[in-house]
Amino acid sequence: MSLKNEPRVNTSALQKIAADMSNIIENLDTRELHFEGEEVDYDVSPSDPKIQEVYIPFSAIYNTQGFKEPNIQTYLSGCPIKAQVLEVERFTSTTRVPSINLYTIELTHGEFKWQVKRKFKHFQEFHRELLKYKAFIRIPIPTRRHTFRRQNVREEPREMPSLPRSSENMIREEQFLGRRKQLEDYLTKILKMPMYRNYHATTEFLDISQLSFIHDLGPKGIEGMIMKRSGGHRIPGLNCCGQGRACYRWSKRWLIVKDSFLLYMKPDSGAIAFVLLVDKEFKIKVGKKETETKYGIRIDNLSRTLILKCNSYRHARWWGGAIEEFIQKHGTNFLKDHRFGSYAAIQENALAKWYVNAKGYFEDVANAMEEANEEIFITDWWLSPEIFLKRPVVEGNRWRLDCILKRKAQQGVRIFIMLYKEVELALGINSEYTKRTLMRLHPNIKVMRHPDHVSSTVYLWAHHEKLVIIDQSVAFVGGIDLAYGRWDDNEHRLTDVGSVKRVTSGPSLGSLPPAAMESMESLRLKDKNEPVQNLPIQKSIDDVDSKLKGIGKPRKFSKFSLYKQLHRHHLHDADSISSIDSTSSYFNHYRSHHNLIHGLKPHFKLFHPSSESEQGLTRPHADTGSIRSLQTGVGELHGETRFWHGKDYCNFVFKDWVQLDKPFADFIDRYSTPRMPWHDIASAVHGKAARDVARHFIQRWNFTKIMKSKYRSLSYPFLLPKSQTTAHELRYQVPGSVHANVQLLRSAADWSAGIKYHEESIHAAYVHVIENSRHYIYIENQFFISCADDKVVFNKIGDAIAQRILKAHRENQKYRVYVVIPLLPGFEGDISTGGGNALQAIMHFNYRTMCRGENSILGQLKAELGNQWINYISFCGLRTHAELEGNLVTELIYVHSKLLIADDNTVIIGSANINDRSMLGKRDSEMAVIVQDTETVPSVMDGKEYQAGRFARGLRLQCFRVVLGYLDDPSEDIQDPVSDKFFKEVWVSTAARNATIYDKVFRCLPNDEVHNLIQLRDFINKPVLAKEDPIRAEEELKKIRGFLVQFPFYFLSEESLLPSVGTKEAIVPMEVWT
C-alpha cells in the first residue's frame, strides 16, 4: 500500500516511529563512548578573505523562533567565534568532596565580547549532548526539523574533536596551563564546524541566543536558562494575579540582560515573554528572606517585582552579582535620579528642530516615515487615517497618512500605534474606527487602545501625548495630533471653498450658445437623479506648478485643463473621495465635478485664457490658494487649491465632528461658515533623545500589552529599546536641525504607564525655568489654569509667574511676560448666547488664573504694584478675517500650542497644557522636551549685547513674525523682547489696535463691553459694520497687522461661569475642568 493511497495511516505510523526513535536517542547513555577522536582538518572558515560579518537587522527581534529550530540565525555570517580560556579558579575543600575547577572563557564574535564560567563537568555534559546529536543525525526520522538538519550537514565533517578524559582531581596546578589549552582547542574546533556550532546545546553552553548579536541592542549581556515566577506586575486593579502572591506558577525561561533592560524568552517558541526596563528603582536582592523562595533572586523596578529561582545559593549569588555588575557598567545613566525628577537624562549636543504650525511638521513627519527601515511608533490623543501630510495634494494619495503607513508596512517596516480610548458618550473622536481602518491595511500595522474604562476604573483622564518615532533614531514631540483640523500654515486661512467657483461678472445664461444651454439642462436633470456622494472621483483640483501667494497680493490667472486636472490624481480606493466642490451658486453648491465635466466636455472649445483677477478677489486676508481660471459661456470659473478635504475643514466651536467614518464628506457648510485656523508648535529630536522618547512609548506599549488580555497574543509583540551606544548612528536627519542639550519630560502614573510613583517632571521644569528666567518668558498654551489654592487647583505655574514679576519689581529690573492663549476654549457652544456649559467652565478657570480673584496673577500683582502690572505682563489671543462668498467674516485662531521660551536660550515644547490635568502627573499622560541652547548668535536684550541661543531665538522670532504679521517685513525690529519700544510700541500697541478694529467692524465676542448676559443680548442685536457698510469695513481691516489681539478681561465678569446645578456638566468632578 503506497503512501499516496493511505496518507493518514502511514503518516501516523511514521510519527510514532519518529517519537520512539527520539525517545531512544534522548535516553542514550553516551558515557561509554570514546572521547578521543580522529584528528581532522576543522578549518572551515570562508575561503574568500573579503567576507565581512553580516549585520543582523534590528527587525530580527520580531522573527525569533524556538531554540531547537534548525534554521535560526544566531551568529554573524562569515564571522568566526574565538574562544580563550583566561583563568582557572580552584575551589578546594578539607572534606572528601573533590576540588572544583572553574574555567573563565572569553569569547569574541565580531564587535561582541563576553565571558562564561564553566566547570569541567559542564564540558563533559556538553560533549555528551554533541555525541548524542551526532548519532541522532544519522537516523532518517521523518520530521521537518530533523530532515532539515540532515540535509544541511550532509557534506560536513562529523568527526568531533577530543575532550580530555583525565579526571579534574588528577590535575596538578602546574598542569592547569595544559588543560586550559586543551579546552580552548576543543571549543575552537567545535565552533568551526557549522554542524555543531548551530546546535542548540552549543548556543546554550556559550550563553547566546538569537538576540545576542543584534548591533542596535548594544553589548552582549548576561544570558542563561532560569526559572521565573509569574505575577509581580504593578497593574491597577489586579490582585492575586498581579502584585499579590496568593497564586503563581514557575516557568523555565531564557533570561537576557542588556544595557538598559532585561527580558526573558520562551525556549519552545522563541517568543519574548516579558521586558523589564532599567530605571532608578532597579534593584537586585538575593536570598530566601527577600524573595520567599529558596535560592531566589528578586529584581525590582518601577513596573514589576520579578522573582527568579536558581539551582543553588552560589548560582543565585552569581546571577545577582553578574546582572548588577553589567547594569552598573553599561546602564548607569538609567539608575540615576535626573533633573526635574525625569525618567530621562540630559542628552548633550543632540540635534533638535522646532516647528511653528503643522505644515512643516507634517511634511517632515512624512519624509521621516518614508525613510523608516525598521519601526514606526505613533501615539496620539486622536489620529485620522485619511489626512494628507503634504498639501496641496499634487501626488494623489502618496502623502495620505494611511497610504504612507500601508506602503511602509508592505516594505517590511513594523508599525505600532497607541490611541487614547475615549469615553464615547463624552468624546466623538471614534478611535475604534481609526483602529479598524489601520489594522486592515497590513499585518505589520498593530494598533492598541487604552485605557479600558471599566477594568481600569479610569474614566476622567486621557493619553494626551503626540509622538512619532522613526527607527528609535528620530522622534517628533509636540502638541500636534495627526488628525483633522490640525494642518495649517502661517497664513491661517479662514476659507477653503475649493476647486471651482463662479464669478458672476461673466456672461448671463441668456447669452449661452444653444449647445451649452442643453448641456446645462442635462446637468440639472442628472444631478436630480444621481446622488453625488456615490461618485468615486477626487474632487479637488491640485495645482502642481503654482505656489502660495502672500496675503492681500494680486493673483494672476492662467489657462488650464479642468478635465485633466480633475482626473490627474485619482484615488486608489473607492472610499478615497474628497468632499464635493461647488461650481457656482447657480448649481446650489451641490453639483459634482463628475457631472460638470461630462456636461461641459463637448464644449471645451469655448474656454479661453482669462485676464487679471476680477475685482473683489484681491481683498486682504482672503483665501489665497493657488488659482487657475477658465472662461465658459456660463461665466468665469476659477480653480483654487483645496487644502482641507472633508472632515478636515472644521470649526469645532460652531460644530463638533460627526460621522468620522465618512472622512471626505463635509460636515459644515464651507460656503457659509469659516474654518477655525489652528496655531500649534512641535519639535523633532535625534539620537539619544529620540531613544528616550522611544523608551517612554515602549514602556506604555508593553504595559498595555500586559494589562489587556486581547493584546497578549504573539501578534502583538513586546517592544525592545535600542541601545544608547548606537544612538549616534543616524541613518536619517531632519533638515534644519541644530545642536543643543535636550532632556525629555513627562507626566505619567500607574494607570498610564504602570509605574510605581507618578512623574510630573514637566511641571517641575516649567516652574524652574520661570523662577530662574532673567529677562522674559513667552508662553503659548491651549489652557491657562493655574494659581494654586490647594483645594481646586494645585499646579504652581501661575504663582511662579506672579512671584517672578514681583521679584523683578523689587529689584527694579525690566522683565516681560508674554502669554498667548485662545480667545475661547475649544468646546462646541454658541458664544452669542453665553456658550455651552463646558466652554463656560474652562473660561471660569482661565479668568480665575489671569485676572479674577485675589489668587489670580493680576490679583497678586495689583496688591503690590497697582496698575504698574501692565509694564510686566501681556495677555493676548489671535484672530483673523477673510471674505467668504462676498461677505466679510472673522474667526479666532485656535491656539493649541504648549510652548515656553525663556531668555532666548531655553525652550519647553510638548503636549502638556497649563492645567492640573497635564501637569500633576497622576491625571493625563503627557510628553515634552526641554531644549537648552549650546550654540549662540549675537543678539540684543534690554538694549545690550547678548548671546542668544540659535534654537530658542529662532523659534521666538518666528512666533513673533507670525502673530505680528512681520513675515514679509524684515524691517521691523523684533530682536529685543525686553525693550520698552518693542513691548509697548509694537506688541501691546499692535494687539490693542487690532482688537479695536475687529470690535468696530465685527463686534467680536468675547468682548470687554459685555459683562453679563443682558448686555450680551443687547450687544449682539446692534448693527455690525461689516454688514452695514462693507466698503468702509474693508478700509478699516486694511489697518490690521498680523493676528495679535488683546485678551478681553471683563467678558461676562458679572456672571458665574461654573456649570449650573442640574446640568450634566455640574455632575462631573471639578478635576475634569482643571
UniProtKB/Swiss-Prot annotation:
The modification Phosphoserine is found at S499, S561, S629. Pfam families: PH, PLDc, PLDc_2, PX. It is an enzyme of class 3 (hydrolase). Residues 81-212 form the PX domain. A lipid is attached at C240, C241 (S-palmitoyl cysteine). Expressed abundantly in the pancreas and heart and at high levels in brain, placenta, spleen, uterus and small intestine. Coiled coil: none annotated. Residues 459-486, 891-918 form the PLD phosphodiesterase domain. InterPro entries: PH-like_dom_sf (IPR011993), PH_domain (IPR001849), PLD-like_dom (IPR025202), PLipase_D/transphosphatidylase (IPR001736), PLipase_D_euk (IPR016555), PLipase_D_fam (IPR015679), PX_dom (IPR001683), PX_dom_sf (IPR036871). Stimulated by phosphatidylinositol 4,5-bisphosphate and phosphatidylinositol 3,4,5-trisphosphate, activated by the phosphokinase C-alpha, by the ADP-ribosylation factor-1 (ARF-1), and to a lesser extent by GTP-binding proteins: RHO A, RAC-1 and CDC42. Inhibited by oleate. Its EC number is 3.1.4.4. GO terms for molecular function: phosphatidylinositol binding; phospholipase D activity. SMART domains: PH, PLDc, PX. Function as phospholipase selective for phosphatidylcholine. Implicated as a critical step in numerous cellular pathways, including signal transduction, membrane trafficking, and the regulation of mitosis. May be involved in the regulation of perinuclear intravesicular membrane traffic. Interacts with PIP5K1B. This is Phospholipase D1.
